[in-house]
Amino acid sequence: MNDFINKMGEYWSQLSFDKLGDILTYHHNAPILFSSGLFFFLFIGFLIIYMSLRKHLLTRIIYVTLFSIYFYYKSSGLFFFLLLFVATSDFCIAQCMTKTASKWGRKAWVVLSLCVDLGLLGYFKYFNFLREIMAAVAHELGYQLGNTSLQNITYQPLDIFLPVGISFFTFQTISYVIDVYRGRIAPLRRWIDYVFYVSFFPQLVAGPIVRARDFIPQIYKTPVVTRAEFGEGLFLVLCGLFKKTVISDYISLNFVDRIFDAPLLYTGVENLLGVYGYALQIYCDFSGYSDMAIGIALLLGFRFNVNFDSPYQSATITEFWRRWHISLSSWLKDYLYISLGGNRKGTIRTYINLLITMLLGGLWHGASVSFILWGALHGVALAVHKFVMNHFSSFKPLGSEMKPWRRVIGVLITFHLVCFGWILFRADSMQTVGEVLTQIFTNFHPEVFMQFVVGYKGVFVLMVVGYILHFMPKSAENGLQAVVTRSPLLVQAVMLAIAIFVVVQFKSAGVQPFIYFQF
């Protein structure tokens, strides 16, 4: 306990007036994270003032918006101006759209919004990728045509910084404009209300992607957090911290990164364990962030939809995408797949629409061939599953309707298909993908497994614990949540203090940025 008090005292000393400049200044190499001690101390102060303003609507909106902009500044520096520009642009476009009577005029406003939003996203995220492709094509043409000037073209990437969370808030603003166009929501009258929605800090930099029709009505309600909701929010924050700080960061730094940095130095069984480790790492990292975002929002009186639902328990690839990153998969379905025609244009067109949707979903994650192939893999898998479901009636039962033995087999097949995709997702190059697969299929050496258990005890234990927690029944998770929810406030405060202590302890080992910050 003395060690805990000393750590807290040390941290408070770091938050003295002498360090105030550091707190207010953006540091490129140290963006603010939910899993950082700094965020927790800032949030506690923010929450106290927030609750005192709960009956003052406009003041509360301005206060939260300013804190959200500060939070984004601490994550991306002066790119908060870009966030404000995108928000202002789409707010004005939605206002103009409602004053336009003709259908084609309204469509023109939607097109303008897409051009602005996707144009900015394309520049910051894909411009270098497109230049690299163009340089490669020019070089190949020069070789074929014997043109030395074309052959001598080399690719030099521009120094373009990717604003944190641009893919997430761009999708949010696009969905708002489209929903206004479709008549599903009325446009907001006040600019500050829309900026509040776009910049709301719990989900700003890595989701979940929140729909305007779900979020905006909650802005105008007086935030009332019951004891049960406070306990639920605290439970989600604690779960997210454990997933991220204890499991994801540890197995990443101590095993997974080593495997993917040099696959040929390890046997096939170690490479396979590295893939299993990354599957757990990315789940704990991203779902951990989502848990914290949902929990923090709940502590502020806002309820978000679940973003992850034990995805590795899925028995089919279709079920996986109903459980993994639910806010993105539902967004792709509602605003891309259905807009392409969905399943209304015939069987072949349905398969093509699935493939296009997942290809663009892969490209959304990153500008590289490996992400495109990852999206293509999932698109083909979804199309194949739909084909099987349509032509073989014995495969139609899903979920709890499946026979237990079939569900076990389905979970194993789906999990390993997803893991194969994670190799594409994690590898720095296609060469690394080839090396990992080569080691797994030609240099397996299963006897090395026991050496892994002995040599990486901490990694092995955390991987076992992580997968057990993931596959445990929902009732067990609800039971754990009930323990936290029903605990006295003093016990909950102790739990939060312990969580902060864990964050401070692990900070010395280097808290890693969330994986989805790069998207």
Q: PLM features: residue spans?
A:
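Membrane-embedded transmembrane alpha-helical bundles that form the catalytic cores
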Residues: 2-518
